[in-house]
C-alpha cells in the first residue's frame, strides 16, 4: 500500500505534492471534475519513498494516460488556503514542486482518471486566456507567459 506524504492534525492539513506544467501548441493542461467549479493543475501527492520527479511522471500518466518526460523543475510553490469540498473548514498548507514537461507536439490524451470517486476531465486552456478562467494555481496566469530558465520560489495565500 502506498502512503501519501501529508498529514492532518485537528483543523490543519498538509500535503507534499508534485505537479506538471504541460504546454502544447499555446495551451496549458488543467484538470477539472463535476464536483469542483474550478480547474486545477495536473499532479498529486508524492508517496513515501518516491521522488517528486517519479511522482509527477506517475501522476501525469494516471491522469492523462500519456507518458510525458520531465524537462526541468520550474517552481517551488508554498500555498496556504482555506479548504473546501472534502477539506471544508481546514487550514491547508501545501508544498508543491512544479515540473515543466517536455512537449510532445500533440494535445491528444487518453484520460480515464478519478479523484475521490469523481471522474476527472482534462482541459486545454489557451495560455493567453488563462486569466479568464478560475484555475489554480493562480500564479500560472503571469508566470507561464514569461517563464524564466530558473527555479522560482512562490508563496501564495489563496482563499
Regions found by a protein language model. Give the residues of each.
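Conserved hydrophobic "DFG−1" position in protein kinase catalytic cores
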Residues: 22, 30, 101-103, 124
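Short connector loops at helix/strand junctions that flank enzyme active sites
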Residues: 15, 23, 41, 68, ...
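Active-site-adjacent beta-strand/loop module that shapes the phosphate/pyrophosphate-binding cleft
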Residues: 81-110, 143
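A generic structural micro-feature
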Residues: 12-14, 87-95, 114-119
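NUDIX/MutT-family hydrolases
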Residues: 100, 111-144
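Conserved Nudix-box catalytic region and its N-terminal flanking loop in Nudix hydrolases
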Residues: 24-66, 75
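Charged phosphate-binding loop/patch that engages nucleotide di/tri-phosphates or the phosphate backbone
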Residues: 136-159
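Acidic, metal-coordinating catalytic segment for phosphate/diphosphate chemistry
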Residues: 1-19, 25, 90
Amino acid at each position: 500500500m502506498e502512503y501519501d506524504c501529508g498529514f492532518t492534525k485537528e483543523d490543519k492539513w498538509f500535503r507534499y505534492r508534485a505537479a506538471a506544467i504541460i504546454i502544447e501548441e499555446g495551451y496549458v493542461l488543467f484538470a477539472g471534475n463535476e464536483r469542483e467549479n474550478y480547474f486545477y493543475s495536473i499532479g498529486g501527492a508524492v508517496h513515501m519513498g518516491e521522488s517528486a520527479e517519479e511522482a509527477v511522471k506517475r501522476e501525469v500518466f494516471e491522469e492523462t494516460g500519456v507518458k510525458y518526460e520531465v524537462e526541468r523543475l520550474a517552481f517551488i510553490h508554498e500555498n496556504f488556503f482555506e479548504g473546501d469540498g472534502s477539506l471544508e473548514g481546514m487550514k491547508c498548507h501545501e508544498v508543491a514542486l512544479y515540473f515543466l514537461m517536455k512537449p510532445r507536439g500533440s494535445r491528444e490524451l487518453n484520460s480515464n482518471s478519478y479523484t475521490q470517486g469523481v471522474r476527472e476531465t482534462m482541459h486545454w486552456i489557451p495560455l493567453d486566456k488563462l486569466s479568464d478562467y478560475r484555475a489554480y494555481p493562480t500564479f500560472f496566469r503571469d508566470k507561464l507567459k514569461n517563464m524564466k530558465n530558473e527555479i522560482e520560489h512562490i508563496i501564495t495565500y489563496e482563499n
